[in-house]
Amino acid sequence: VEIIANDQGNR
């Protein structure tokens, strides 16, 4: 799977 960083808490 690929993990996509976003501004909703994944960073």
From Swiss-Prot:
Superkingdom of source: Eukaryota
GO molecular function, one term: ATP binding
The keyword Zinc appears for this protein: no
Alphabetical UniProt keywords: ATP-binding, Nucleotide-binding, Stress response
Similarity remark: Belongs to the heat shock protein 70 family.
Additional notes on this entry: On the 2D-gel the determined pI of this protein (spot N164) is: 5.4, its MW is: 73 kDa.
Protein name: Heat shock 70 kDa protein
Organism of origin: Pinus pinaster (Maritime pine)
